[in-house]
Amino acid sequence: MSPNLTSSSDLFTQEQKEKLLNPINHSQVTQDLSENVILTTVDDLYNWARLSSLWPLLYGTACCFIEFAALIGSRFDFDRFGLVPRSSPRQADLIITAGTITMKMAPALVRLYEQMPDPKYVIAMGACTITGGMFSSDSTTAVRGVDKLIPVDVYIPGCPPRPEAIFDAIVKLRKKVANDSIQVRPEQNHRYYSTTHTMKATSPILTGQYLRAQTRQAPPLELSEAMGMPIPPALMTTEQKEEVDRG
């Protein structure tokens, strides 16, 4: 062997060997590595496989689930998107919250979401799921928005939304999955969580004084005028009182 040639063991110091054999830091995907051609191709293939086989969890608590059930039928045929309904959260990667979420159902929903494998996605379907809907004003048990419990990827407004709207939400979710990268996939950013909803405060309805209300003692002014009934003196304006006094 020529004296000018050195063995591979002489090229590395003992400290460098320790770093190679026993790395301290965890492996991370850097920006340079994420732009690698091979890794980018594998990432696109992985995203294509995921968006082509989204398995939703059968979860429904109210009338919105009827529209979701119609989506499974032959008329709309959502199997063409690769969606296979699952009854177990451990086999699903998508949950469509269809219906009102109550305080008693909230822990069960969070438990189902936590049992789903990552990455997992959530579609909020219907007004009751998004803001509480018609129960948001005086209900003491309805949750005002499912995004206060679990993060939401896509919202579907409506009461209830039609199956075509669910298709539109699934298409938007597929586009979102297609743009995911291996660098940010574990973080699952661009999601909505703990959104504060500003609702208009109104006077309470259930006050216990319903039978004593003025509308129970006499019909409303608009109804009296429409039916040609004599307007009670309490509902008359100043001009109407003057006309009655004049005869």
Swiss-Prot record:
GO terms for biological process: aerobic respiration; electron transport coupled proton transport; photosynthesis, light reaction. Binds 1 [4Fe-4S] cluster. GO terms for cellular component: plasma membrane-derived thylakoid membrane; respiratory chain complex I. Pfam families: Oxidored_q6. The keyword Cell division does not apply. [4Fe-4S] cluster binds at C63, C64, C128, C159. SUPFAM superfamilies: HydA/Nqo6-like (SSF56770). Its main location: membrane. It is a peripheral membrane protein. Its cofactor is [4Fe-4S] cluster. GO terms for molecular function: 4 iron, 4 sulfur cluster binding; iron ion binding; NADH dehydrogenase (ubiquinone) activity; quinone binding. Keywords: 4Fe-4S, Iron, Iron-sulfur, Membrane, Metal-binding, NAD, NADP, Plastoquinone, Quinone, Thylakoid, Translocase, Transport. It is found in: Cellular thylakoid membrane. Belongs to the complex I 20 kDa subunit family. HAMAP family: NDH1_NuoB. NDH-1 can be composed of about 15 different subunits; different subcomplexes with different compositions have been identified which probably have different functions. This is NAD(P)H-quinone oxidoreductase subunit K.
